[in-house]
């Protein structure tokens, strides 16, 4: 049997700086891509390994998008829960949408609601991994949803040696293919989220994808999906143009001094303004200086203006100082 495995889709609408219509198009594009991969690689089954939804209480609009996404998958599939779909320690919101998912896929997709064991593969869903005792294994291949280790800060959420009864474990949770690891002689492989779920400084490579697994040989092929639309955050200087992208969602951090940033108009492309001129407490010797002298010293030592700019400002200020005096 040949299995397509994807996980951590994280269907979500309303994310800051991410237009809903762009996000919808991106997920439907992903659905069509996964469907093409399934058929082009002669797969027999597609398994979605948890966190297809971003939250356990999705909005009606997000459920509508889930239905549209699933309807693109015109092939047999099984879907099991991840941590993001858990309403309680034992109940997943996917259990409530099992009928909807089955209906919009014309009966081709099934939501796994309990531990699954078979000669071809086992499924240990998220609501099973924290149990003291698991249902005995049947296969040497396991599909699951579990947080592994990312040294030095991210620790496994359970004792991963519980998977040592398997030769190969295909998992959702960690969002990068590079997080694949071993547990003794057991392979713990992550395909990565098929879409970027947060903004990156540049397009990701070698991170986002899906797997094709042969259940007879346990051969695993990773397919990169980094060419799909991504979330990009760029940094530019004040005065540089914020260029929109027709494909990716690109937002901009704009750097400059206080005066420059004040002139930046709000835009849906603007992420934030960054004052790059961070100074220590100013210590200027203002003894025996009149008001114009104080201004000249401030513009030269703090604002670092050219002498020409300072002279023009002082000339304009002089008449106001005269009136003030």
UniProtKB/Swiss-Prot annotation:
GO molecular function: exonuclease activity
Induction behaviour: Expressed in the early phase of the viral replicative cycle.
Keywords from the named record: Bacterial host gene expression shutoff by virus, Degradation of host chromosome by virus, DNA damage, DNA repair, Early protein, Exonuclease, Host gene expression shutoff by virus, Host-virus interaction, Hydrolase, Nuclease
BP terms from Gene Ontology: degradation of host chromosome by virus; DNA repair; symbiont-mediated suppression of host gene expression
Known EC number: 3.1.11.-
Gene3D superfamilies: 3.60.21.10
Biological function: Possible exonuclease involved in phage DNA recombination, replication, and repair.
Oligomeric form and interacting partners: Could consist of two subunits: D13 and D12.
Protein name according to UniProt: Probable exonuclease subunit 1
Species whose genome carries this gene: Escherichia phage T5 (Enterobacteria phage T5)
Gene: D12
């Amino acid at each position: 049997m040949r299995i397509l495995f994807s996980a951590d889709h994280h269907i979500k609408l309303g994310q800051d700086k991410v237009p809903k219509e762009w996000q919808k198009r991106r997920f439907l594009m992903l659905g069509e891509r996964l469907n093409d991969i399934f058929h082009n690689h002669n797969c027999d089954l597609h398994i979605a390994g948890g966190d297809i939804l971003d939250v356990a209480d999705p909005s009606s609009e997000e459920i509508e998008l889930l239905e549209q996404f699933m309807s693109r998958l015109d092939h047999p599939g099984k879907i099991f829960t991840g941590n993001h779909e858990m309403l309680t320690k034992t109940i997943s919101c996917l259990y409530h949408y099992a009928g909807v998912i089955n209906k919009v896929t014309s009966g081709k997709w099934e939501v796994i609601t309990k531990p699954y064991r078979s000669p071809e593969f086992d499924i240990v869903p998220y609501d099973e991994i924290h149990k003291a005792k698991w249902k005995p294994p049947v296969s040497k291949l396991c599909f699951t949803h579990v947080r592994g280790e990312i040294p030095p800060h991210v620790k496994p959420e359970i004792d991963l040696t519980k998977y040592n009864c398997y030769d190969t474990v295909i998992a959702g949770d960690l969002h990068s293919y590079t997080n694949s690891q071993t547990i003794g002689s057991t392979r713990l492989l992550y395909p990565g989220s098929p879409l970027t779920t947060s903004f990156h400084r540049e397009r990701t490579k070698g991170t986002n994808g899906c797997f094709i697994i042969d259940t007879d040989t346990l051969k695993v092929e990773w397919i990169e999906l980094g060419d799909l639309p991504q979330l990009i955050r760029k940094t530019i200087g004040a005065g540089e143009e914020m260029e929109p992208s027709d494909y990716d969602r690109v937002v901009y951090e704009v750097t400059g001094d206080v005066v420059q940033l004040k002139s930046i108009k709000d835009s849906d492309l603007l992420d934030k303004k960054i004052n790059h001129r961070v100074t220590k407490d100013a210590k200027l010797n203002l003894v025996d200086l009149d008001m114009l002298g104080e201004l000249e010293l401030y513009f030269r030592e703090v604002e670092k203006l050219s002498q020409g700019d300072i002279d023009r400002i002082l000339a304009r200020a002089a008449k106001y100082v005269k009136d003030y005096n």
